[in-house]
C-alpha cells in the first residue's frame, strides 16, 4: 500500500484579492496535510492560482493594465495569504506557468486523439462571473444563473467535449466509488445532475484572448475550467511518468467549495476518463462562510479580510476558530463574538491556562524537570482513566480524519483538556506538596503527559502554538508524530522543561 498522500485545494481565481473563504479552504486542506504528515505519510500538498479567462481579462482592462501584470500582482496576494495563514503547501501552481501550459496542450491532444473533442458552434447562456455555461432551464426570469450571477447569450464557434457519452460511465463510477464525493448530500446532488442528462460541453472560446490557445488553432482559447482542472496533474509533472505524477496521482483528496462541485465531480472525472487517466479518489465539498446570512464572496463585496483577523487575533487563533466553528461540509456564519469566545473559552482557558499552571508548578517546585518517577509508576499512570481517554482519542482522531470530521477531532482534544482541568482540581498538587510528595510527583507527571497528548494532537490545527507547547514540555522534535502517542514514548522522567510562557493570551 502506498504511503503517499496527495491533497489539493482548488486553485484560486485571481480577479480580486483573497478573503476568508479562501483562507478556510486553505486552512482545512493544510490541517489535513499536516495531520497526514503526523501519521507518517509522504505528503504532497498543492495550491495555486487560476489566471486565465474572460473575467480576468475584463478585470485587467478595468484596471488599465495587461493581464499578465494583473495576474502577477493578484497571484502574489494568494501567496501572501498562504504565508500569513502558515499554510504548508509543497507547491504553488500558476496556470500562466509554462509547465502548466505544456501539460494542458498534451492533455488537449490526448482528448483529441481519443475522439473526445469535435468542432461545432455554441449558442447559449454563459456567466462571465462563474466562467460557466448554463442550460435554459437553469436561468431565472431575471437572467441570472443558479449562483445569482448574471448571464449573457453567447454565439460563437467552439470545440466540444463529448460529455454526454460519459453519462453512464460516470454513474457507474459513482456507484463503484461511494466516497468519491463527500458529504453524501453533495454526492446525491451530483448523481441527480448527471441522471437528469448530460449535454456535450463547449471547451473553447473565440470572443476573448487571455488563455491557453488551442493547439494548431490559435483563434480558439481553451475553456478556462478545462485549463484550470489540469493544474492538479500539471503540478506533478504530467505527462512525465518519472515525475511526481506517477508517485502521487491519483489524488487522495481534493478539497473544493460547493459552488464548484459540478466542475470537479462531473467534468473533471469525465475529462480524465477520456484521457485514460484515473480520477481522484475523493472530492470533499465544504460549505460557505456567510456574513449576516449571505455568502462571503468577492463578487458580492462583503468579504472579510483574513490578514486583518490574523493581525488582530493571531494566526493560530484564527486557524483554530475556522476549524472549530463549523462541521466540515456545512455553512457557517462568521461573527467576531464567536471568534473571541472560542479563543478565550477554549484556547486560553481550557488549554493555555492548564499548560501554564502545570509547567509553572513543575518549573518552580521540581527544579524545572519532569518528575523523576519509576517506570512501574508510569505503567500505573497509564492505567488511569485520563490516560486511557487520551490514548482512545489519539486512535479515534485518525478514524475521524478519514471521514474529514475535523471539528470532532478538536472536540476530543478540548474534552481531554477539560478532563485534565478537573483532574488537577481534584488532586490539588499544591496540597499534596505538603502531605504526599511522591503522590504530587505522580499527579504532575500525569498532567504533563496528558498535555503531551494535547499538544501533539493540536499540531495540524495550531502548528506554531502546539510546537511551543511541546518545546515547553521538553518533547524532542523527532518525537512529535502520532505514533509517539503511546506509553513507550512517554515523557522521560528527569528531563528538562522550559521556563513557562503564555501561549494563548486572552483577548
UniProtKB/Swiss-Prot annotation:
The keyword Protein transport does not apply. The keyword Cell membrane does not apply. It is found in: Cytoplasm. GO terms for biological process: methionyl-tRNA aminoacylation. Its EC number is 6.1.1.10. GO terms for molecular function: ATP binding; methionine-tRNA ligase activity. A motif ('KMSKS' region) lies at residues 295-299. HAMAP family: Met_tRNA_synth_type2. PANTHER family: METHIONINE--TRNA LIGASE, MITOCHONDRIAL (PTHR43326:SF1), METHIONYL-TRNA SYNTHETASE (PTHR43326). This is Methionine--tRNA ligase. It comes from Rickettsia typhi (strain ATCC VR-144 / Wilmington). The gene is metG.
